[in-house]
């Protein structure tokens, strides 16, 4: 009786501990890898998405039939899959290279050249490469500031790298020019 991952007729198939063939499900073999087995043939699927037991969990299985992880370019989309192979949607993620990325809540596509809101009402801006920007940035007609974690600064006085002191509006985050603003300790500044 077959058990585990077996190759039959050039196709990988999976049999549970009782010897029953797994079909239409994701299974983890002894090698620790996740694979999806087609609901009709039972063959390991390749180059396709499959839904997990939880309806919100999606996986993508590469050419080798194994669930992909990390940043992946699939067609015209750049997507991210966590260490368990689940597609990440609607979240801010810090990658191994320390870059901060956001993946759309509906499509899972990486945000590029746009703002996205984090889980605690903080705002980020993602550049053309999909990385959260930091420091002083000119975006459209506005000059904005983002902290070292990529979060937009609003309603605060900030000392920039050049030692200049700037204030960023509490609503828009735009740098104050030609106006007074109150600091955190009731001190007033004029920004020209």
Give the positions of each predicted feature.
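Extracellular adhesion/carbohydrate-binding repeat motifs centered on closely spaced tryptophans
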Residues: 1-192
């Amino acid at each position: 009786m077959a058990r585990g991952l077996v190759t039959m007729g050039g196709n990988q198939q999976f049999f549970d501990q009782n010897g029953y063939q797994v079909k239409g499900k994701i299974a983890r073999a002894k090698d620790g890898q996740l694979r999806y087995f087609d609901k009709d043939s039972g063959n390991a699927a390749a180059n396709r998405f499959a839904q997990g037991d939880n309806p919100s969990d999606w996986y993508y299985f590469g050419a080798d039939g194994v669930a992909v992880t990390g940043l992946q370019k699939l067609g015209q989309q750049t997507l991210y899959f966590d260490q368990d192979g689940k597609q990440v949607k609607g979240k801010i993620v810090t990658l191994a290279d320390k870059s901060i990325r956001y993946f759309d809540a509906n499509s899972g596509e990486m945000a590029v050249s746009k703002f996205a809101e984090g889980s605690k009402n903080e705002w980020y801006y993602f550049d053309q490469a999909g990385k959260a920007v930091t420091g002083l940035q000119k975006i459209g007609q506005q000059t904005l500031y983002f902290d070292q974690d990529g979060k937009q600064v609003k309603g605060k006085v900030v000392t920039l790298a050049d030692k200049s002191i700037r204030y960023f509006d509490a609503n828009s985050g735009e740098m104050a020019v030609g106006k007074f603003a109150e600091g955190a300790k009731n001190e007033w500044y004029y920004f020209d």
